């Protein structure tokens, strides 16, 4: 028995005790057994339950000891809260007192309005601190006092104190029982009998007193336990309810107190703006007066305002050096290192005129604005520049950069001194910052990126006015919606709560790039096209002069009720389908549309994903890259529950760790999801990151778990900012001695794709790359005009192939059929089966640029140099250069016989002038002599392509109806995909030095006359007829060569043609005036897109198959101008071959 008791006392866990000791007695059983024993001691079985009572008391004592320990910790924590709250109240009272005194100082002076504001804020702080003091009193009375009473009363002492009387009664009973048992055995032994056991009935009367004492102490113990249970359970919770009501009153009263100042705060914000303007004006006047007085005190002409100006002799010697001098100028520090204003800049063009330009110096960068506001300003890093005064003109100075010299002139001598001082000081400051280390440089670069993003956001359509009331220059951003509002409307956005709109200031808050994702991709116009599509008439939309009541009613209806949004889905399943499509197509505006229709963003998708129960956010994270983070950000900020789990228990945090998405993880952790949720494998997201060695995800999750994660975080994202080069000049735009505009830099070929392809497959297509890779891919995939399937065992898709975009760089028209580079050099092995609509390619002779002039080709018969592939006798001299990428003929061989590609008949060339000379048309050429032959190795299995039908003389006129191509008329898809090329097989990326020099204005020929055009046309035809016999013979035998040898010979021959293409006997091509863009049409033209198209430049239009475009003008016959029907903000130029003209 004693050994059993010792085993019981060794247990420490309540659960293990209850599980290992089944022989217990409940209170009801104890009452029944004791009552029966009291009424009939001889027949009672109470003695058999004594051990059960002992076990029960032991377990209850263990439970009470655990509760005592837990309640002591609770009391300690609550007391710490109370003490820190008292300190906080005291600090708030001190703050309010000092603020009130500071405001009183203003009241006694000449700024009573500011003093009143400080006093009101002091009063607000006092009232809030009083409310907090009341809350702390409630915490003390309701929680601390209750815990104190319980721990110092019934639970006082240590483990075992409560059951000491019970233990004594048990001990007495045992001793008496042992004594009687011994006597009975001795008595039986005297009579020659052996007693094995003694029944309770035999000793019932003898043990009655001890049994009654045991029962009494058991009752006392159970009564005590019952009282403790009531106090630690029901009573404590009732007091916590009282404290909850005190908390509710605290927050409600605090909100009421703050609301009292709301109207005053709104008025104060406007008054502060006016006061600041007045103070700025005073400062400006004082600064001007200071400068005037300072200039009158200058006596030595060689030392102006502390700025050392070298003598004329020294200046002359320095100007003759033409480089950097050993000793730099020392600027007057009083002028600082930042300045904005206007300078006259001498152009480097033909006329050498002075042009007034807005300039700004900040952070070691000189910014020079262009004459046209739609161009990014040029930026010069002053660390690589030198300022040199002009000895001949006291108001002029030169700025020598690494590649050119800028000539500036100030308005007067004082302004001249200021500019030179600021430039010198800013350069010195930037140099000091550079020497401090990389950390400050990184911070500055991140700040510069943030500023550039904000500037780009402010240039988005509609962002120049408030999204809700139309006030100009809004500076308050809703980070979860991507819109800009004014300060009045932003206050109402704050009232609605962060679950509706999260407001930040573009000017006052320090934003991270993660908070600008949606702002960069939405814009006020795009957002209102959805959220204000069904505005009633008359419109309830407020104006800049509307009062706060009107604004609040409208904004609440717009953002909370979505009353004015466009409705496109009739059922919840349709909404979920639209949500899925929006994520798959990465269409943020489509996502906003389903959000406006009230879809539950965290509902499981209807289409099964990697795991059952995937939500849109799971899918967006799983398929995310640096171009789709804005979709993830929108879902994270606008869905209610980030802890939604899939069927196997994975949250979105688990997905980030599983698929290695640290940038998505940053966006998620900003909204503080639960980081310790486990999946069915018992793993948290942090466990998965550690197991998969996802270091970035592990670090971020560890920071979040320890509470050290910074929500203003930077994310790696393809921002696609419209920034020009640092040292770009605007002289080509400003001088304008002739109508020829500066050529654009080489751009990559556009690639189109079927609308049925997933985003992953689109990314695998050649040429479909991020802007970072676009330039590199453009050379390897430039002439790809045919896409083939990567799987030969799948049937041909009924969707036919799209044509390539008409190239948009000026070049000469070819006279022979163009060939394509080997498909193996361009097609990714990871792409899925891809078959597209194939239409005749546009004439390669025209490549669109800003400076394309009309063509001199005469109307009537086609170019005589156009020869089918089967009868190729070589290109004419006027087409050699243009065919650098297109002149490599392909030859596909089979196991039985060689198969030549069928003839392809091109449409007639549009009437354009071949603008550039041969030596200026090399901007896309590669050094073909250095390209390995493997680069141009052709596929060993290409099915024969049928001959294409002729298109007719010319593309259809803009007002004529172009018939939509039928599936049956289109040629079949090639057979087998060649092997994927290795990295070493690709041609080298062209360097800047390989590009041709920019044509100067003086090199351009004069305006052409009609006779010159006819003479040029005749000379062109004549040169096509007269070909050297050796060249014809050589080209006729290329079919007998192996593919590798043929490709190498073609490359070397093309390179030699490029170098010897100048023909002195031919007259130089005249340059006419550029064709005017035709925008005046009496009837609205509508065209329907029949392919997908991804824009390569900002002025081009991105669209998908099936959209309708309103034509607003023509840039030329191959490129038209227009916008998507119903979405005027989506506008730009588009290729004619990608659309079908509608009859209406």
From Swiss-Prot:
Which keywords appear in this protein's UniProt record, sorted alphabetically? ANK repeat, Cilium biogenesis/degradation, Cytoplasm, Golgi apparatus, GTPase activation, Membrane, Metal-binding, Phosphoprotein, Repeat, SH3 domain, Zinc, Zinc-finger
GO MF terms, alphabetically ordered: GTPase activator activity; phosphatidylinositol-3,4,5-trisphosphate binding; phosphatidylinositol-4,5-bisphosphate binding; phosphatidylserine binding; zinc ion binding
Against InterPro entries, the record matches this protein to:
AH/BAR_dom_sf (IPR027267), Ankyrin_rpt (IPR002110), Ankyrin_rpt-contain_sf (IPR036770), ARFGAP/RecO (IPR037278), ArfGAP_dom (IPR001164), ArfGAP_dom_sf (IPR038508), ASAP (IPR043593), ASAP1_BAR (IPR037928)
Q: Where is there biased composition of kind Pro residues?
A: 947-958, 971-981
Phosphotyrosine PTM positions read 308
Q: Which residues are annotated as modified residue Phosphoserine in the UniProt record? A: 729, 738, 851, 855, 1023, 1042, 1056, 1143
Composition skew (Acidic residues), residue ranges: 725-734
Which Pfam families does UniProt cross-reference here?
Answer: Ank_2 (PF12796), ArfGap (PF01412), BAR_3 (PF16746), PH (PF00169), SH3_9 (PF14604)
Top-level taxon of the source organism:
Eukaryota
Q: Major location, coarse class? A: cytoplasm
Residue ranges for the region (Disordered) are 308-330, 722-771, 790-1077
Where is the signal peptide, in residue numbers?
none
- Activity regulation per the record? Activity stimulated by phosphatidylinositol 4,5-bisphosphate (PIP2).
- Tell me where in this chain the Arf-GAP domain is found: 451-574
Keyword Repeat assigned: yes
Q: Where is the composition biased (Low complexity)?
A: 790-800, 821-834, 889-900
Q: Give residue spans, biased composition: Polar residues.
A: 312-330, 747-759, 1030-1049
User: Where do the ZnF regions (C4-type) fall?
Assistant: 466-489
Q: Does the keyword Transport apply?
A: no
Protein's cellular compartments: Cytoplasm; Membrane; Golgi apparatus; Golgi apparatus, trans-Golgi network
Which pairs are disulfide-linked? none
Anything noted about its domains?
The PH domain most probably contributes to the phosphoinositide-dependent regulation of ADP ribosylation factors.
Q: What does this gene product do? A: Possesses phosphatidylinositol 4,5-bisphosphate-dependent GTPase-activating protein activity for ARF1 (ADP ribosylation factor 1) and ARF5 and a lesser activity towards ARF6. May coordinate membrane trafficking with cell growth or actin cytoskeleton remodeling by binding to both SRC and PIP2. May function as a signal transduction protein involved in the differentiation of fibroblasts into adipocytes and possibly other cell types.
Protein name from the UniProt record: Arf-GAP with SH3 domain, ANK repeat and PH domain-containing protein 1
| Organism, scientific name | Rattus norvegicus (Rat)
Q: What taxonomic ancestry is recorded?
A: Eukaryota, Metazoa, Chordata, Craniata, Vertebrata
Gene name of this polypeptide: Asap1
């Amino acid at each position: 028995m004693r050994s059993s008791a010792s085993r019981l006392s060794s247990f420490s866990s309540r659960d293990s005790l209850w599980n290992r000791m089944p022989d217990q007695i409940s209170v009801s059983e104890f009452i029944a057994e004791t009552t029966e024993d009291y009424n009939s001691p001889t027949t009672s079985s109470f003695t058999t339950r004594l051990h059960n009572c002992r076990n029960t008391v032991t377990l209850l004592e263990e439970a009470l000891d655990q509760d005592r320990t837990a309640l002591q910790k609770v009391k300690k924590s609550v007391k710490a809260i109370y003490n820190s709250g008292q300190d906080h109240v005291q600090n708030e009272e001190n703050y309010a007192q000092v603020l009130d005194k500071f405001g009183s100082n203003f009241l006694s002076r000449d700024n009573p309005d500011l003093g009143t504001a400080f006093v009101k804020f002091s009063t607000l702080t006092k009232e809030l601190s009083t409310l907090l003091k009341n809350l702390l009193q409630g915490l003390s009375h309701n929680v601390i006092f209750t815990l104190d009473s319980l721990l110092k009363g019934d639970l006082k002492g240590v483990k075992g104190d409560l059951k000491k009387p019970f233990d004594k009664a048990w001990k007495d009973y045992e001793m008496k029982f042992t004594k009687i048992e011994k006597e009975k055995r001795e008595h039986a032994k005297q009579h020659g009998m052996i007693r094995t056991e003694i029944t309770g009935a035999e000793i019932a009367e003898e043990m009655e007193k001890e049994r009654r004492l045991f029962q009494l102490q058991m009752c006392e113990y159970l009564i005590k336990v019952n009282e403790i249970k009531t106090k630690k359970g029901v009573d404590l919770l009732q007091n916590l309810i009282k404290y909850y009501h005190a908390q509710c009153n605290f927050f409600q009263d605090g909100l009421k107190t703050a609301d009292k100042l709301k109207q005053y705060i709104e008025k104060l914000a406007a008054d502060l703006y006016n006061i600041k303007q007045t103070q700025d004006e005073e400062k400006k006047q004082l600064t001007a007066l200071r400068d005037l007085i300072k200039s009158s005190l200058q006596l030595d002409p060689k030392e102006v305002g502390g700025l050392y100006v070298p003598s004329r002799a020294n200046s002359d010697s320095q100007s003759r050096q033409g480089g950097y001098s050993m000793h730099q100028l020392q600027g007057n520090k009083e002028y600082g290192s930042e300045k904005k204003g206007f300078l006259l800049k001498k152009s480097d063009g033909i006329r050498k005129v002075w042009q007034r330009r807005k300039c700004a110096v900040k952070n070691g960068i000189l910014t020079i604005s262009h004459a046209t506001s739609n161009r990014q300003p040029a930026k010069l890093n002053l660390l690589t520049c030198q300022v040199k005064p002009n000895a001949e003109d006291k108001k002029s100075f030169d700025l020598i950069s690494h590649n050119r010299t800028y000539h500036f002139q100030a308005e007067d001598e004082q302004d001249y001194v200021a500019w030179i001082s600021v430039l010198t000081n800013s350069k010195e400051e930037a140099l000091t910052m550079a020497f401090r280390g990389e950390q400050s440089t990184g911070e500055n670069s991140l700040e510069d990126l943030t500023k550039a993003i904000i500037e780009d956001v402010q240039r988005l359509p509609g962002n120049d006015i408030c999204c809700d009331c139309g006030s100009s220059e809004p500076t308050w951003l809703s980070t979860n919606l991507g819109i800009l509002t004014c300060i009045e409307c932003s206050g109402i956005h704050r009232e609605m709560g962060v679950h509706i709109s999260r407001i930040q200031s573009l000017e006052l808050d320090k934003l991270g790039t993660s908070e600008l994702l949606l702002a960069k991709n939405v814009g006020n116009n795009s957002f209102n096209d959805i959220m204000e599509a069904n505005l009633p008439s008359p419109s309830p939309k407020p104006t800049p002069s509307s009062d706060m009541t009107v604004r609040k009613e409208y904004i609440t209806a717009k953002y909370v009720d979505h009353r004015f949004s466009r409705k496109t889905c009739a059922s919840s399943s349709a909404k979920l389908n639209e949500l899925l499509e929006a994520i798959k197509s990465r269409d943020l505006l489509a996502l906003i549309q389903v959000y406006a229709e009230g879809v539950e963003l965290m509902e499981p998708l209807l289409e099964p994903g990697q795991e059952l129960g995937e939500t849109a956010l799971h899918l967006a994270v799983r398929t995310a890259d640096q171009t789709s983070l804005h979709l993830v950000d929108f879902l994270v900020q606008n869905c209610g529950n980030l802890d939604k789990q899939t069927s196997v228990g994975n949250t979105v945090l688990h997905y980030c760790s599983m698929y290695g998405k640290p940038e998505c993880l940053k966006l998620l952790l900003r909204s503080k999801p639960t980081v310790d949720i486990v999946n069915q494998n018992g793993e948290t997201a942090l466990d998965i990151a550690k197991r998969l060695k996802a270091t970035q995800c592990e670090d971020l999750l560890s920071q979040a778990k320890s509470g050290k994660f910074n929500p203003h975080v930077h994310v790696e994202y393809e921002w696609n900012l419209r920034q020009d080069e640092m040292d770009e000049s605007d002289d080509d735009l400003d001088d304008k001695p002739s109508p020829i505009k500066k050529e654009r830099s080489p751009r990559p070929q556009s690639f189109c794709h079927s609308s049925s392809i997933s985003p992953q497959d689109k990314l695998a297509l050649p040429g479909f790359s991020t802007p970072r890779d676009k330039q590199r891919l453009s050379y390897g995939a430039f002439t790809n005009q045919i896409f083939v399937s990567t799987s030969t065992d799948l049937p041909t898709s009924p969707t036919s192939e799209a044509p390539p975009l008409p190239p948009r760089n000026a070049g000469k028209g070819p006279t022979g059929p163009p060939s394509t580079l080997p498909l193996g050099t361009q097609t990714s092995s990871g792409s899925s089966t891809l078959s597209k609509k194939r239409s005749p390619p546009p004439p390669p002779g025209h490549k669109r640029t800003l400076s394309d002039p009309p063509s001199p080709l005469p109307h009537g018969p086609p170019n005589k140099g156009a020869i089918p592939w089967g009868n190729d006798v070589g290109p004419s001299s006027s087409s050699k250069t243009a065919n650098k990428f297109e002149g490599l003929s392909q030859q596909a061989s089979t196991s039985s016989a060689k198969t030549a590609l069928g003839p392809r008949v091109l449409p007639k060339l549009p009437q354009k002038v071949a603008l550039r000379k041969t030596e200026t048309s090399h901007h896309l050429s590669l050094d073909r002599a250095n390209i390995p032959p493997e680069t141009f190795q052709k596929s060993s299995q290409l099915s024969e392509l049928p001959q294409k039908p002729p298109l007719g003389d010319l593309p259809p006129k803009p007002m004529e109806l172009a018939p939509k191509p039928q599936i049956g008329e289109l040629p079949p898809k090639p057979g087998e995909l060649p092997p994927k090329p290795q990295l070493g097989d690709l041609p080298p990326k062209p360097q800047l030095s390989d590009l041709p020099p920019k044509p100067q204005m003086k090199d351009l020929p004069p305006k052409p006359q009609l006779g010159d055009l006819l003479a040029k046309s005749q000379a062109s035809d004549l040169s096509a007829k007269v070909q050297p016999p050796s060249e014809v013979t050589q080209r006729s035998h290329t079919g007998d060569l192996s593919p590798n040898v043929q490709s190498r010979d073609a490359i070397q021959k093309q390179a030699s043609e490029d170098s010897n293409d100048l023909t002195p006997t031919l007259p130089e091509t005249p340059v006419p005036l550029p064709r005017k863009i035709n925008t005046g049409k009496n009837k609205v033209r509508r065209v329907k897109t029949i392919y997908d198209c991804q824009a390569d430049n900002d002025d081009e239009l991105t669209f998908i198959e099936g959209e309708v475009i309103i034509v607003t003008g023509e840039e030329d016959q191959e490129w038209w101008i227009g916008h998507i029907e119903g979405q005027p903000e989506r506008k730009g130029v588009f290729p004619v071959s990608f659309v079908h003209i509608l009859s209406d």
